[in-house]
Every structure is written in C-alpha cells, then in structure tokens.
From Swiss-Prot:
GO terms for biological process: DNA catabolic process. GO terms for cellular component: endoplasmic reticulum; nucleus. The active site is at E113, H164. It holds the Pfam family Exo_endo_phos. Glycans are attached at N102, N133, N239. GO terms for molecular function: deoxyribonuclease I activity; DNA binding. Belongs to the DNase I family. Coiled coil: none annotated. The keyword Hydrolase applies. Keywords: Disulfide bond, Endonuclease, Endoplasmic reticulum, Glycoprotein, Hydrolase, Nuclease, Signal. This is Deoxyribonuclease-1-like 1. It comes from Rattus norvegicus (Rat). It is found in: Endoplasmic reticulum.
Length: 312
C-alpha cells in the first residue's frame, strides 16, 4: 500500500460480535455454574434440648452450622416436644425457607432420641419417608428413611438413611444397615442412597479388621466418602472417624463434588471448651453438583481462550 494512503479500520460484522458474545457467555455459565452444589450434612448434636439451644452462644453456632446445609440430618435430639427444632427454625427462617421432618423418639431404655431432617424447602421437598421396621430389634435407634427431591436432571431424587449406632453393637448394626439399603431400594425403586450419621465406626468401637469385613465394605457399589483416619471429633484427646457418609448409586457418583468434615471450632474460632457446649462431634457433609461432572473448570478456561482465539 502506498505510503500516505489512509487506512480505514475493518468493520466487524454484527453477527461476529454476537457469536463472540454468545461463546463467552455460554462458557462462563458453564465455568461459574459448575461450582454450584447441593450440600447434605449429618451432625450428632449431642443431647440437643431447648434448654441447650436457648443459650445464645450455642444457638448462634448451631444456626451457622445448619445454614450451610440444604439438608441436615440431626442426631441425638432428645426433646420429646417439637420446641427445640421449632426454635432453631425460627432463627433460620430470617433469610431462607426451612422445613423439618422428624422421627418418633427411639431407644430401648428411658433415654431416647430422634432423627430430625432440617431442609431448605425452597430447594428440596420430601417425597417419601418411613421408619424402618426393625422386627428383630437389631438397632437401638432404627433408621428413619426419607427420599428428597434434588435440583438435578441427572438425579431427580435421593434417599437418605441416617443411623446413630450404639457403641457396643456397632458391627451388628452396620451389617444390618445393608438390609435397610435393600429394603428401601426395592420399596422405592431407587438405588441412589446415602447412608450417613454417627456410626461409631472407629477406635475402640470398631477395629479396622472388623470395619473392613462389614457388608457395606465388601459388597460392590458402596463408597465411603469420609476417609478412614479423618477425625470427626472435637476433643484434642481423641482422633476417631466415628461419623461417616456412605454413597451408593451411579447418579450419586456422577454428581459427587466433595465430601468432608466441617471443623466448626476452627471456622468459628471457638476454643475446645466453647465448641463442646455445642457438640463433641464435627458435622460431616457431601456436596452434589446439580449437573454431572463434565469439563473441569481449568479445562473450561482453556476452552474459553481457544474459542476466543478462533473467533479472531
């Protein structure tokens, strides 16, 4: 081109601009949307009563723990009325919608406790529930089983089976939990089942050799997503993986994002003494993606850059 001749910028077609914007928007939706997860938790709240929760420090911590979860399964709720749970729901309802579902009081002696589901009613609903019929009295507190909807086309519902074992019968109860799985999966034709709670599945209550011989360990398809060796206790003097989450089903596996204990004393900067006023256990939790795990975020970032370069 002769020097001095004016150079006019090339006009970018509107269709090109629109396509570029669509690619960027679509990939960003995938990148950001992939981080959205549904959290299911289990927590041995250590003899939860109204007298305990009306203490401000305990109530504040419990509400913060509960607010993290889309479904929380509480154990050791020993209130014969609904007052404890209703009080907690009143504190939670300020920002989001919550409902609850509870079992009857369970136990063989004068000491009895409930299983209580507290859940985000704007994100999930109860489809079915029942108290397992423990005809042989194997369980001290037989599972209170519930089926919940999930915000996922891959897995529209999941079954939760909570259990708080008694320490002297851990092995027997955990082996019987396999029968509960068979019962519920046949009853509702759903093999996407999460077994969770304070199993007492470690230390003096269950030696490693006995743990590895459990039916839930030897039968195919069960995934213990809280690792052996993960401390689920608050006391510095103990290091035991009592609390567990066991998942079954292809849908659960496809949507699994993460599983962990929640170290609430560390998160909320509590001393051990302060934390023990709430519980001597950490909550355990599992996060499910709303869509199947597909392209990892770092690959999506690379794909975004490549797509933009191809568009010029």
């Amino acid at each position: 081109m002769p020097s001095g001749q004016p150079v006019f910028p090339r006009r970018v077609p509107d269709a090109y601009i629109a396509m570029r914007g669509l690619v960027v928007a679509s990939l960003l939706i995938l990148l950001v949307g992939g981080t959205d997860a549904f959290r299911i938790c289990a927590f041995n709240a250590h003899r939860l009563t109204l007298t305990k929760v009306i203490k401000e420090s305990v109530m504040d911590t419990l509400v913060q723990i509960l607010a993290r979860c889309d479904i929380m399964v509480l154990q050791e709720v020993v209130d014969s009325s609904q007052n404890t749970v209703l009080f907690l729901l009143q504190k939670l309802q300020s920002s989001k919608s919550y409902s609850f579902l509870n079992s009857s009081l369970l136990g063989r002696s004068t000491y009895k406790e409930k299983y209580v589901y507290i859940y985000r009613s704007d994100k999930t609903q109860v489809l079915n529930f029942y108290q397992y019929n423990d005809t042989e009295d194997i369980f001290a507190r037989e599972p209170f089983v519930a089926q919940f909807t999930l915000p996922s086309k891959i897995l529209p519902s999941v079954v939760l089976v909570p259990l708080h074992t008694t320490p002297k019968d851990v092995e027997k109860e955990l082996n019987a939990l396999y029968d509960v799985f068979l019962d519920v999966s046949q009853r509702w034709q759903n093999e996407n089942v999460i077994l969770l709670g304070d199993f007492n599945a470690d230390c003096a209550s269950l030696a490693k050799k006995r743990l590895n011989s459990l039916l839930l360990r030897t039968k195919a398809g069960f995934h213990w997503v809280i690792p052996d060796g993960e401390d689920t206790t608050v006391r510095a003097s103990t290091n035991c993986t009592y609390d567990r989450i066991v998942m079954h089903g292809q849908g659960c596996q496809k949507l699994l994002k993460a599983a962990a204990t929640f170290d609430f004393p560390r998160r909320f900067q509590l001393t051990e003494e302060e934390a023990l006023r709430v519980s001597d256990h950490y909550p355990v939790e599992v996060e499910l993606n709303k869509a199947a795990q597909g392209i990892p975020p770092h690959c999506l970032s690379t794909l975004l850059l490549l797509s933009l370069s191809q568009l010029g």
